[in-house]
Amino acid sequence: MKIDPKTFIQDYHLNLCIQCGTCTGGCPVKFRSPLNMRRLVRQTAYTDNPSPLFKRPELWACTTCSTCTLRCPTGVKNVDLIMGIRNFLVQKGEVPSTIRDALENTLLQGNPWGRFRDRRVDWAKDLGVKILGEAKAEALLYVGCAPSYDPRVQNISVALVRIFQKAGLDFGILGKKESCCGNEIRRMGEETLFKKLAKDNTALFIKSGIKRIITISPHCFNAFKNDYPDIGIPVQHYTQVIVDLIEMGKLRPSKEVITLATYHDPCFLGKQNKIFDEPRKILTSIPGLDFADMERSKQRSLCCEGGGGRMWAEGGTEGMRNGEIRIKEAISLGAKVIATSCPFCLLTFEDAVKISGSSDQIIVKDVSELVAEAM
């Protein structure tokens, strides 16, 4: 369906904007990019033909963290506007080459990096985990793209399998049949491909006979919970499951992990889905681990810049990355570990530690890795 930018005014409530600037004031990339959400909303609403505005490279700097939308006092759908503009550009074939490649890779191989589908389950080769279709299970551990292919993030997948096996959880994975959840695909503007992924994944979930879905990534959690129209299956992020297992006495972290740790709230888990307490409950249950929050935490957490397709976008920003800022904040707190529960956050922070030369001061861990150490 052809997109008419003139419909954006009604579709995204642009006429409600009072030009207060709250959106721009809270934007995590405002100091690194010319992106100005207040100005974009006004220009889109009051320009006869806003299409030329959409060719600005800074439109790809948005991480879709939703800080602007959540803080807007009148209900303007700022992030939906960004997604609508990107969808318009996708239809016109006017997207950056790296974004184009990520979208094509997902269509062809089921993941934005273009890794072979046959290699999607290599990480689980010796773990004895059930493959749904070959066996039945109560829960699906939906692994996701980065936890399937990225060598660093695969450690999270392995840790969670061992944790769930230790707790006696009846779960399985989809193996080679698993495809991208589509969360970033939609936020990069490919609405048609997202709808195909949602339809195909939903059919696969239902066919597998599982009773619930457990995700590793908050981005997958968000897609299944909020964007899939007909999924009809309960969805949990793994931190919710681990808390339940601890509270039921099925999982007991018993080994000491002597360190001072802080926690970074991923945008798609915290801001957008209000899961703040579970990761902290897990960390404080680990013997020997002292915990302290950074000043910017929970709803005020600083976006790492990994969402909204930023993992595949180039340009549009300059200056110190938010990941580096976040690492400095954690170090100033005295933390030796910055923990998170999102593969994208983990990767951006690990890059930030290397770039800032801070590897002798702090390490980056996923919450699941700390739990596995304590088992």
Language-model regions: role of each:
Residues 5, 11-14, 31, 41-216, ...:
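Iron-sulfur-cluster electron-transfer modules
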Residues 17-23, 27, 62-68, 72, ...:
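Short cysteine clusters
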Residues 139, 260-261, 338:
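Conserved hydrophobic helix-helix packing surfaces used for dimerization/oligomerization
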Residues 147-237, 268-284, 290-375:
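Cofactor-cradling patches in redox/metallo enzymes
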Residues 17-41, 271-274:
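A broadly conserved sequence feature marking short terminus-proximal activation segments
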Residues 1-9, 35-52, 277-288, 310-314, ...:
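Short, charged low-complexity linear segments at domain edges
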Residues 236-241, 247, 251-273, 285:
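Catalytic cores of enzyme domains
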Residues 1-24:
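Flexible, acidic/Gly-rich N-terminal and inter-domain linker regions that tether
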